[in-house]
Amino acid sequence: PFLVYAFASGPEPGHTGAPGEKGTCTACHAGTANSGPGSVRVEFPGGENYTPGATQRLRVVVSDPDQVRWGFQLTARRAADAASQAGSFTPADANSQVICADSGLNQQTCSAATPLQYIEHTQAGTRSGTRQSAAFEFDWTPPSTDVGNIVIYVAGNAANGNNFNSGDRIYTRSYTLAPQAASQKPSIAAEGGVVNGATFQPGIAAGSWVTIKGSNFGSNTRVWQADEIVNGKLPTSL
């Protein structure tokens, strides 16, 4: 991503380091990628995998102890064919935008002629004056069917904010995501499926706790804090 003046609003497509691209952001920024003290990383909510058709909220973090302005560009490709787009992106806020290959236009739906999609920073997303790190969040929806492994390519720019290409630091990284089978729907047991949470017997009164027995339930938990118990009454929401 280019944070010289002309590209503060986001770079042209094709600078993530993916195969067949123009290179990385070092094409316009002096220096060698990954030579500074910082880094770029992508945070995946469920680990480095994907469920076909299931949208994930991804988070890109660019960090460098010395820098004060930030940018990124990211794309998703099929591992078996790096020229094939893998899913689609949707910005979560004004800090990122979607562009298509061979187009400087801000457009979320790419044509058949330019099917490769990128997500990158906007001018607002550069957050000039913010020190040490910046994060960008957006949604990625993988293909609706299993296409095998998917590779995420990302380049981050940790800039010094002088509006020139000197002193900026470029960081790159890639991640390979494996397909994950869609989880089965929860199933409540036929016998003793829903019972009173205190007595473990049938008969549910309004406002009471219940115990639900079955299979394929999620592993998430919820712990109530002391300040949530008011006048001896426990919370009734998760």
Task: Give residue ranges: language-model regions.
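Sequence context surrounding c-type heme c attachment/ligation sites in exported
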Residues: 2-141, 145-182
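Beta-strand/beta-sandwich contexts
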Residues: 182-236
